[in-house]
């Protein structure tokens, strides 16, 4: 790769980022990481009514949670002068022309075209307006919106994901670049920014393929270098529905608050719909090494929350204490007990936050379940003296087995119910020393402790 790549992720701060946004953000950031390039975070905040500072701040925070730290950052709202200059250049070249139709007029025109079996594309009627007609519209209070005059030709490129691709621009309406109120739609600011900062690779969802035909012509009209384009498959719900910011439970913020690990979200967002086996990858560098745009599937990539649960659990089961000690402390686990507790319970966790329930089992209060009072009373008499250690459980259960003849489930389940109040959980050989003799005695006696 000749030049050091510069890629970008450009969300609109009109809602919280969701798992579908994470895919292009990660593909870009990991591509830059692998190729020794840079990553630009650009806020496309030209929608003045819907863009908010809350969502802008949240976007940066959520990307940081995923491990994405931009090398460059800017907002489009700070760069209007650049867009104004580009728009004037296009007007002077005859590529940006004023139109005065109302939305209702355009809708009626589209319906007439469809009724005649014609494609519903803009007919360029505004190009035939005389100066007098334009003046009359403006005297009537109409302000023009501005369309980019497309060359009616095929735009072709070698897509980084899809291979040889093309768009026949003769089948497209001339796109509106400037609204009647003077604000800009997505297309012109995006091209101006990419050209001005030198974006080399535009990696985005396949829903932008048609936009690429338009944008290539815009780059050329502005005498700017055309970047390489790659259009990846989109994440959908498990049912095949498109993801949107309205799906709050799949927002990155909600996933973080629900206790998912960023590595699990990263791995699933990137590897789903690729040639790689979907598996948890903790290291960003390792995950970056697996990003091969040419091997992404053309089929939609289905995001299944159940798969995320499994991925998260696999990560948690392998986590060392160093990765979780602060979170355990926040749950009330003292430093001196943290290692033994974590090693005891992590294989039973789906999320680190689930450890809170097991700390309560250890620390109490627990209401015991005494399913077999006589058996538990005999077992209590055989409970070893303090201090408890790794061999205490085996020594105790061997003694109980010899005394009562109980074995297997008949031996272990009544003891588990009495000590934890539950019929499942971590290995009691590891839990019993954490519970301690005093609590064990009280629970075996049927007391809440």
Swiss-Prot record:
A motif ('KMSKS' region) lies at residues 242-246. GO terms for molecular function: ATP binding; glutamate-tRNA ligase activity; tRNA binding. Gene3D superfamilies: 1.10.10.350, HUPs. One of its GO terms (biological process) is glutamyl-tRNA aminoacylation. The keyword ATP-binding applies. InterPro entries: aa-tRNA-synth_I_cd-bd, aa-tRNA-synth_I_codon-bd_sub2, aa-tRNA-synth_I_CS, aa_tRNA-synth_I_cd-bd_sf, Glu-tRNA-ligase_bac/mito, Glu/Gln-tRNA-synth, Glu/Gln-tRNA-synth_Ib_cat-dom, GluQ/Sye. It catalyses: tRNA(Glu) + L-glutamate + ATP = L-glutamyl-tRNA(Glu) + AMP + diphosphate. A motif ('HIGH' region) lies at residues 11-21. One of its GO terms (cellular component) is cytoplasm. Its main location: cytoplasm. SUPFAM superfamilies: An anticodon-binding domain of class I aminoacyl-tRNA synthetases (SSF48163), Nucleotidylyl transferase (SSF52374). It comes from the Bacteria. It is found in: Cytoplasm. Keywords: Aminoacyl-tRNA synthetase, ATP-binding, Cytoplasm, Ligase, Nucleotide-binding, Protein biosynthesis. Its EC number is 6.1.1.17. ATP binds at residue 245. Pfam families: Anticodon_2, tRNA-synt_1c. Signal peptide: none annotated. Belongs to the class-I aminoacyl-tRNA synthetase family. Glutamate--tRNA ligase type 1 subfamily. HAMAP family: Glu_tRNA_synth_type1. Monomer. This is Glutamate--tRNA ligase 2. It comes from Methylorubrum extorquens (strain PA1) (Methylobacterium extorquens). The lineage of its organism: Bacteria, Pseudomonadati, Pseudomonadota, Alphaproteobacteria, Hyphomicrobiales.
């Amino acid at each position: 790769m000749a030049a050091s790549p510069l890629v970008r992720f450009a969300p609109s701060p009109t809602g919280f980022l969701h798992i579908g946004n994470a895919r292009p953000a990660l593909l870009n950031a990991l591509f830059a990481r692998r190729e020794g390039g840079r990553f630009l975070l650009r806020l496309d905040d030209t929608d003045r009514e819907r863009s908010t500072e809350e969502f802008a701040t949240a976007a940066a925070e959520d990307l940081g949670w995923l491990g994405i730290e931009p090398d460059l950052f800017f907002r489009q709202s700070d760069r209007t002068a650049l867009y104004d200059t580009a728009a004037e250049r296009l007007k002077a070249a005859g590529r940006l022309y004023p139109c005065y139709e109302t939305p209702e007029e355009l809708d009626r025109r589209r319906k007439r075209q469809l009724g005649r079996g014609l494609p519903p594309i803009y007919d360029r009627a505004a190009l035939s307006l005389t100066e007098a007609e334009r003046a009359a519209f403006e005297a009537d209070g109409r302000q023009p919106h501005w369309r980019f005059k497309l060359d009616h030709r095929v735009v072709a490129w070698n897509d980084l994901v899809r291979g040889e691709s093309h768009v026949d621009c003769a089948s497209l309406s001339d796109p509106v670049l400037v609204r009647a109120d003077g604000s800009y739609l997505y297309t012109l600011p995006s091209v101006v920014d990419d050209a001005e900062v030198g974006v080399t690779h535009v990696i985005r969802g396949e829903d932008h393929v048609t936009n690429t035909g338009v944008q290539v012509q815009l780059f050329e009209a502005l005498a700017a270098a055309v970047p390489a384009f790659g259009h990846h498959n989109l994440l959908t719900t498990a049912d095949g529905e498109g993801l949107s910011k309205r799906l709050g439970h799949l927002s990155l913020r909600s996933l973080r608050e629900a206790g998912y690990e960023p590595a699990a979200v990263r791995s699933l967002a990137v590897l789903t719909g690729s040639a790689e086996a979907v598996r948890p990858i903790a290291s960003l560098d390792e995950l970056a090494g697996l990003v091969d745009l040419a091997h992404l599937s053309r089929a939609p990539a289905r995001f299944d929350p159940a798969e995320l649960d499994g991925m998260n659990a696999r990560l948690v089961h392998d986590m060392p204490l160093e990765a979780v000690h602060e979170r355990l402390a926040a749950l009330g686990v003292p430093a001196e007990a943290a290692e033994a507790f974590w090693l005891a319970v992590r294989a039973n966790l789906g999320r680190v936050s689930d450890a809170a329930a097991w700390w309560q089992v250890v620390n109490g209060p627990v209401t015991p379940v005494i399913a077999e009072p006589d058996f538990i009373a005999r077992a209590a008499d055989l409970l070893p003296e303090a201090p408890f250690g790794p061999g205490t459980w085996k020594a105790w259960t061997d003694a109980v087995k010899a005394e009562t003849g109980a074995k297997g489930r008949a031996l272990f389940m009544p003891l588990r119910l009495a000590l934890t109040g539950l019929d499942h959980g971590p290995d009691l050989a590891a839990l019993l020393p954490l519970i301690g003799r005093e609590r064990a005695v009280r629970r075996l006696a049927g007391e809440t402790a």
